[in-house]
Amino acid sequence: MVCTPAENFNNSLTIASKPKNEAGLAPLLLTVLELVRQLMEAQVIRRMEEDLLSEPDLERAADSLQKLEEQILHLCEMFEVDPADLNINLGEIGTLLPSSGSYYPGQPSSRPSVLELLDRLLNTGIVVDGEIDLGIAQIDLIHAKLRLVLTSKPI
């Protein structure tokens, strides 16, 4: 039986009332959104410091980042996820996100986070080359050869 989005419509409306431990992928997706939001914020700060943004561009970026943060907090409330739980502790690697106020782009930090590493890689630029095989039940179904150029600068 094929399941269409319309068949699951009522289930999706009630997901917000489920307990935290049944929130499914919501905490993970919110964590990724917050990571991307903070990466964009760091890039806006870098461009502001280098005088690469006009005043209207800076205002638009600041407004957009603020609205995105509000939406993430609203979704956290809907799914009963504590925003502090979005910062995952990765053991020896450190935390995913820096603690509030502890990181400013371009400045060294006493306890670097994964976000800081990604921000520095974006600022410097990096090329990732590799192959990915995706599958299920020990059957390779998708083969991909990738070359990814990750940078905040125009290519």
From Swiss-Prot:
The keyword Isomerase does not apply. One of its GO terms (biological process) is gas vesicle organization. GO terms for molecular function: structural molecule activity. It comes from the Bacteria. InterPro entries: Gas-vesicle_GvpA-like (IPR000638), GvpK (IPR007805). Keywords: Gas vesicle. It holds the Pfam family GvpK. It is found in: Gas vesicle. GO terms for cellular component: gas vesicle; vesicle membrane. Might be involved in nucleating gas vesicle formation. Gas vesicles (GV) are hollow, gas filled proteinaceous nanostructures. During planktonic growth they allow positioning of the organism at a favorable depth for light or nutrient acquisition. Belongs to the gas vesicle GvpK family. This is Gas vesicle protein K.
